[in-house]
Each structure stands twice: as C-alpha cells, then as structure tokens.
Amino acid sequence: MKSSKVEIVSREHKIPEVRFENQRLTSFAGLIVFQGLFKELAIKQKLQNCFSHLKVSPIFGNHLIALCLIVHLLLGYRKLRDMDYYRDDPMVKRLLGVTRLPDVSTVSRAMARVDQDSVEKIRQLCRRWVLERLERTGISRLTLDFDGVVFSTQGRGREGTAVGFNRKKKGARSYYPLFCTIAQTGQVFDVHHRPGNVHDSNGAKGFVLACLERIRQALPYVTLEVRMDSAFFSDEMVGLLDQMGIEFTLSVPFERFAELKGLIEQRQRWRRQDETWSYFDCSWKPKKWSTRYRFLFIRQRCKELYREPIQLDLFIPQTYGYQYTVLVTNKKIGMRKVLRFHHGRGSQEKLFGELKSQSQMDYIAVRRLSGNQLYLMTAILAHNLTRELQMRTEQKARGTTEKRTPVWRFEELATLRHHILQRAGRFTWPKGKLTLTITDNPALRKDLLHYLDAFKEAA
C-alpha cells in the first residue's frame, strides 16, 4: 500500500532531555539464546573443573572470570576496561549467574593467577566440545587445516613475546600460535602457543601428530585429510602423514628443490582446467628421499607481474603472464579435484579474519603469558560456541564439497550481534512471572523464537 508524504515525514526536531535511572533495562536481550546453550553444555561447571586445582578461593571464582571473558567477547568488546559500559546490565548478570560483575582490576588479577595447567585444561575442554559435535554430526570425512597467526603488541613487557618476521609491523614483539581448524564445521580444534621469533614449522610435528591421534581415537571411522602450506613441508612431515594413512596436500617451496624449475620449463603439454588454471602431475622424489610421491605442478594465468625480489635461473620459474605452484599429495583422485581441495584452504584465512575482527583473538590483554593464553582460549570458545549455537538450531545446508566448504551456512558473530544480541529489553514480573519484553520487530521475533523454540524441543 502506497503511503502519502504527510504520513511519512516528521517535523519533530526537538532534542529530548536525558535522564539516568536504575531500571531493569538491558541492552543485550538477545543473550537469552546463549542462556539455553550454556545450560545444555553445563559450561559453568566444566570451566570450574578447569581451575579446581588452584588453591586460591576468591569471591569471583576463576571459572566466572573465564565465563565473563567469553560473554565480553560475544558482545563485541575488546579491552578489559570496556566492561565498565555494561556492568549494570541485568541480562549479562543473569547469564553469568551473579548479582554484580567483577571490577576490571579483579579480572586482570585473576588472569595473572592462571597457570599453565588451567590453560591446558581449557584446551582439553575446547577439544572435547568439538569432538562431541563431530560425533553427533556423523561426518565420514574430516579435513584439518594447520597454519600460524601473528599477534603483535607495541609494548615490551608482555611475557613470552619476541621479535620475529612480521610483514605488517616490522620489529614489533609478537606471539605466533599454531592453529588446527576443522573445515566442515569452521571451528578451532586446538592451538599451540608460541613466541613470535619461531618458524612456522617450530613444534608443528608434535602438534599435528597429537591432533590427528586425538581425533582418530575419538572418531576411528572417519577418514582424515590434512592441508598445509609450504612452511610445513619436509620429508619427515610427508612421511609421517603417509605412514599414518592420512590423505594430505602440501605446498612445495621451489627453494628446496632446484629440479622443480627444470621440470616445469621442460614441460610442453599442460592439461587445461579453464582459462586460468592448467596443470600436470608426475611421480617423483628428491634425491635424498626414499619414496616417490605424486607431485602436482600448477600454472596460473595472471595479469599481475611478479613484484618480489627474484634470483633468475636458480629456483622459481619465470614466465610472463604465469605463476607456478607445486603440491605433493597421496590422494588418488583427479588433478582437478586435488587442486580444488587444496584451494579450499582459503576458508581458513576467512576464519582467522573473523576470529581477529569479531572475537578479538589477536588482542594481548595483560602482561602475563598465561593470562594472554586464557584470553586467546576464551576468544576461541566464544567463536566455537557461536558455531555450536547455529549447528544445534539449523539444518545442514550441503554435503561434502570438493573444497570442503562448511556443511552449514554460518552467520558471522558480528551479524548475530546486530540482528539478535544487541537488542534493548526490560525485565518485569507480571503476576510473579519473570518476563523479558522486547520491541515487536517481525524479523527479530522470527529469528529469536527460532533459536528459543529449538532449545525447548531439545529439552
């Protein structure tokens, strides 16, 4: 129905008077959807078990501090000092199960008290929740991506930081944790914390082996796949994955084997996939290797010139209009499918971007190493819980694709904040019944009731 201009235009321009009163008003009414999830997961009790070995018994338990950090990140805040802006919010206090929130100084002192045993137990809890989700999902093929991420800081007093390779902030001290992510669910399975002055492969063998063994022990019927970039390439890593029966693709650095350049330059016939990609494969082994593997040589047509420093006639083939990459794999499928499978690693970069920008994963909150590790783990848990919320309430959108795209269509945490979490509401007790009143927006009503009804059916 068409409306007239008189019905649309408002002439009210007066700025209202502002008053501040203590009322039962919340700015985060949408947190009620996480209340049901936290109850089903028994998150408070399980976090309490992670700190049960600590002898200190503060008024605010360490598990409450960890849960407070998770909610803090779910709401989109970054610095600890930002807690002052919602400490009187009744919905946040109900979700945490407290009558008042801890002071910022209390939170920072609690983070300083955390030890490595507590961090390790939280890592175990994170892995357990991911494995429980994978077991319920019933996925027969599981893809693991491994990569490191740099967390920079401007301060020099952060324990465990070091100056290392940092493309964006040269000379800055940083951490360089190594992550294991699950492609099908878009969750972080585990993280290996490291200082910023180590190579990507530092500690990678033990971490990769531990992740694979834990998943295989919990899900022995699942076919495991691994994707890695050239920083993890080595004869030892390739042999380990092949010996364990893990399907893998690894990028091969040209600098390791001068023969690769000759194989590409001597090749006359390339199998074409489309106007951009062409490739060929062969069974080959370097001189010091004892076993032959399948190497896939890829040529990409591109208009952009190679702008990095080059050493002609040494390692990297230089052809105008093309870029070259090499993969090593033990997969038996066609070259096109191997290429698309490896290119699916791009979803992990998107995941890291979401973790940094929306879960504040890269923020270094305190001076103590264990406190910063706790902050990192709460950021990971906030992300994983957001994915768990959607997987419990939504149906799968697709099966296993060539790129191993997540089988659910996930909304980003920022989208959930804007659509659901950051909504005004009022707590009232009509006839003695606790009620949360929210504005009657049709889109909000539909989404909010969808989540609440899903938890009622599960109960």
Stretches found by the model and what they are:
Residues 1-172, 176-199, 203-218, 241-244, ...:
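Dynamic "connector" segments at or just before major functional cores
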Residues 2-16, 20, 247-357, 447-459:
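An anionic, glycine-rich sequence signature occurring as long contiguous blocks
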Residues 37, 83, 88, 335-369, ...:
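Short amphipathic alpha-helical "interface-anchor" segments enriched in bulky aromatics
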Residues 141-145, 223-227, 247-249:
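Structural preference for beta-strand elements that scaffold enzyme active sites
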Residues 149-151, 187, 194-196, 253-255, ...:
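Short, glycine-/Ser/Thr-/acidic-enriched flexible segments
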Residues 226-234, 254-257:
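Acidic, metal-coordinating catalytic cores used for nucleic-acid/nucleotide bond scission
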Residues 235-239:
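Catalytic cores of alpha/beta
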Residues 361-394, 398-434, 438:
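Basic, amphipathic alpha-helical segments enriched in Lys/Arg and hydrophobic/aromatic residues
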